[in-house]
Amino acid sequence: MAEDINAEEYPTEIHDYLTTFEKSLTSVDEMLKTMMSVSRSELLQKLEPLEQAKLDLVSAYTLNSMFWVYLATQGINPKEHPVKQELERIRTYMNKVKEIADKKKASKLDKGAASRFVRNALWEPNPENGQTPAKAKKRKMN
């Protein structure tokens, strides 16, 4: 794309930007081809529900982002287009899914271990046998 146009037809400052843009488009095209080579139902069967939600959200966000870029290339301000609200809505759901994933990763309380820890931390010597924790642990070697 950028190589086909003479450098005299556009300012030289944007040549690097055009080259980077072309590489990005090629990368996106390759990724989409890879993603579309597998059927959606086949892909969803391999994923857990949370991963399915993530895939759906990323797909929707990608399509809307590409439409945003298309609008920008056509001279339309995407900030004034309904696609902006759609991207914000998708971001909201992405944050909700992230919260759910974070809750799943959060450490859980082991009630049995916690009760043993508290019980042993609050141990008091039995006044009847006069043992202290240090004396109770010592063993005689005969």
UniProtKB/Swiss-Prot annotation:
Q: Which family does it belong to?
A: Belongs to the C1D family.
One biological-process term from Gene Ontology? regulation of gene expression
Region called Required for transcriptional repression, residue ranges = 1-100
Q: What is the lineage of its organism?
A: Eukaryota, Metazoa, Chordata, Craniata, Vertebrata
Major location category of this protein? nucleus
Encoding gene (name)? C1D
Q: What is this protein called?
A: Nuclear nucleic acid-binding protein C1D
Q: Region Disordered: start and end of each range?
A: 120-142
Query: What's the stated role of this polypeptide?
Result: Plays a role in the recruitment of the exosome to pre-rRNA to mediate the 3'-5' end processing of the 5.8S rRNA.
Q: Which GO terms describe its molecular function?
A: DNA binding; RNA binding
| One cellular-component annotation, GO | nucleolus
Q: How does it assemble?
A: Monomer and homodimer. Associates with the RNA exosome complex.
Please give the coiled-coil regions recorded for this protein. none
